[in-house]
């Protein structure tokens, strides 16, 4: 069984809440096998940032993310994994191979800022720029350094999931591994063999069959050329297209 241990920042919840909800569903794997064990870590930064977005910017996605985190925490801590409202209306069973950790504020006091800077090896200029960061980003770095570098468990490797370019930059400067929601979703969907992965594989196979030429771009990625008359569209759900 593959294990994935994700530190989720505010942008991961705000822009990828639907993905996170799907990961938590017990019926994500069509053959019923447990191929994935998930651990989610929610830093203090994430909760504070989502609260700020909810009240100052009236962000609906931030509000929904906070509600979901609260439901998830209650369900995982009390063992009430049946009939958790993952979507807006539909009740789902929460997967049993899922752990949620909400950060204790005391952890931030245990990690000093000089400790965080000790993991930056890019020179004094980078350290100076880190020293000028807003407090909220320093708090996030403390959380990530603790989970990725200081926690006494070599068996677990934590990865920060973020959609924020600035967070990605400062994470790299402190040697904190990170990935995007799309990257995380692609890996988990493949392991769970869920519908989104199967549809993607089906579409890619169709493109390969109908392609007339293959080449590589400057980044080394494969490019498939097709005839205009044989345009392949992504699969869509059944139903009538809505028109105003």
UniProtKB/Swiss-Prot annotation:
Main subcellular localisation: cytoplasm
Gene Ontology terms: biological process: nuclear-transcribed mRNA catabolic process, nonsense-mediated decay
Keywords associated with the record: Cytoplasm, Nonsense-mediated mRNA decay
Organism superkingdom: Eukaryota
Tagged with keyword Cell inner membrane: no
Localization of this protein: Cytoplasm
Any one GO CC term of the record: cytoplasm
Protein task: Involved in nonsense-mediated decay of mRNAs containing premature stop codons.
Name this polypeptide is given: Nonsense-mediated decay protein 4
Lineage of origin: Eukaryota, Fungi, Dikarya, Ascomycota, Saccharomycotina
